[in-house]
Amino acid sequence: MKNKRSQNSPYITPNSSYTTLEKALGYSFKDKRLLEQALTHKSCKLALNNERLEFLGDAVLGLVIGELLYHKFYQYDEGKLSKLRASIVSAHGFTKLAKAIALQDYLRVSSSEEISNGREKPSILSSAFEALMAGVYLEAGLAKVQKIMQNLLNRAYKRLDLEHLFMDYKTALQELTQAQFCVIPTYQLLKEKGPDHHKEFEMALYIQDKMYATAKGKSKKEAEQQCAYQALQKLKEAK
C-alpha cells in the first residue's frame, strides 16, 4: 500500500480507510478516533499517540495469552508455559501477529520514520499491535480480545506448541558461532531510556569484534534475543 504525506500534517498517513484493517482484525471500532490513536506513533508529535494504549495492551495481552496457553497446554508445567508466553508476548511475537493483519500499512508515523522504514521496525509495529488490542479491550471487553487473539495465533503460526513456537535464539547463535568461528557472541548495551515502568533497551551484538545486529526491547534479554535472531539470519544468508 502506498502512503502519502498530507500538506497540513507532518506525518505519513495511509491512502485508504481503515475498513480493510478492521475486516482483517475481525472487529469494527465504534470510535474511529480510538483506532486512529492506537495507530499513531509518538514520532508524529500529536497530542494523542499510542503510548498509553500500549501500556494497557501489554497487560491485557499478557493475561489473554497466559490464559489461552493455560487451557490449551494442560500438560505443561509453569516453566514451559512461561517460555511459550515469552515467545509470543515479545516484540518479535507481536510483530508476527501484526503482520498477519498488515498493520504496518496503517501506522501513522513521522516523515523521518517513514524514510527510515520505521513502520517495519519491530519496536514500532509491536507497540502498535499492543495499542490496537487495548482499543478493542476498552470498547468490547476481554472476551473479544480473546477471540481475536485465538484467530490471529491460528493464522500466524502453523503449529502452536513448545517445539515449534519457542526458540532460544541466543543459545542457537552461540552454538553456531562456536562451531564456525570458535568464539561466542558478545552483547553491549547501547541505550536505556524511559521511566522504570516503561523501559526500553537497545542492545548491540558483536561476533569477533564486528557488529552484527542492534535491536530494542522492553528488557535487555528481549533485545538480546532480537539481536541473536537477526545475526542468525545474516549468517544463514552468508552460507
UniProtKB/Swiss-Prot annotation:
Record-linked CDD domains: DSRM_RNAse_III_family, RIBOc
Subcellular locations according to the entry: Cytoplasm
Ligand binding (Mg(2+)): 54, 127, 130
Major localization listed first in the record, in broad terms: cytoplasm
Entry-linked SMART domains: DSRM (SM00358), RIBOc (SM00535)
Active-site residue list: 58, 130
Positions in coiled-coil regions: none
Pfam families according to UniProt: dsrm (PF00035), Ribonucleas_3_3 (PF14622)
Enzyme Commission identifier(s): 3.1.26.3
GO BP annotations listed: mRNA processing; regulation of gene expression; RNA processing; rRNA processing; tRNA processing
Swiss-Prot/TrEMBL catalytic activity: Endonucleolytic cleavage to 5'-phosphomonoester
Domain RNase III: 18-141
Alphabetical keyword list: Cytoplasm, Endonuclease, Hydrolase, Magnesium, Metal-binding, mRNA processing, Nuclease, RNA-binding, rRNA processing, rRNA-binding, tRNA processing
Top-tier EC class: hydrolase
DRBM domain sequence ranges: 168-237
Cofactor: Mg(2+)
Single GO molecular function: ribonuclease III activity
GO cellular component, one term: cytosol
Described purpose of this protein according to its UniProt entry: Digests double-stranded RNA. Involved in the processing of primary rRNA transcript to yield the immediate precursors to the large and small rRNAs (23S and 16S). Processes some mRNAs, and tRNAs when they are encoded in the rRNA operon. Processes pre-crRNA and tracrRNA of type II CRISPR loci if present in the organism.
Assembly and interaction partners: Homodimer.
Family: Belongs to the ribonuclease III family.
Protein's UniProt name: Ribonuclease 3
The organism of origin for this protein: Helicobacter pylori (strain ATCC 700392 / 26695) (Campylobacter pylori)
